[in-house]
Amino acid sequence: NEVCPPGECQQYCCDLRKCKCINLSFYGLTCNCDS
């Protein structure tokens, strides 16, 4: 899981075809990707 800029989920930090952006209060937005 890579940390994304606040409020955004971009393809450079996640593959949106495989990943969902999840907002974790401590980490901010992260990419949750299927392995």
UniProtKB/Swiss-Prot annotation:
Keywords: Disulfide bond, Secreted, Toxin. One of its GO terms (molecular function) is toxin activity. Signal peptide: none annotated. It is found in: Secreted. Contains 4 disulfide bonds. Expressed by the venom duct. The keyword Protein transport does not apply. One of its GO terms (cellular component) is extracellular region. Its main location: secreted. The cysteine framework is XV (C-C-CC-C-C-C-C). This is Augerpeptide hheTx4. It comes from Hastula hectica (Sea snail).
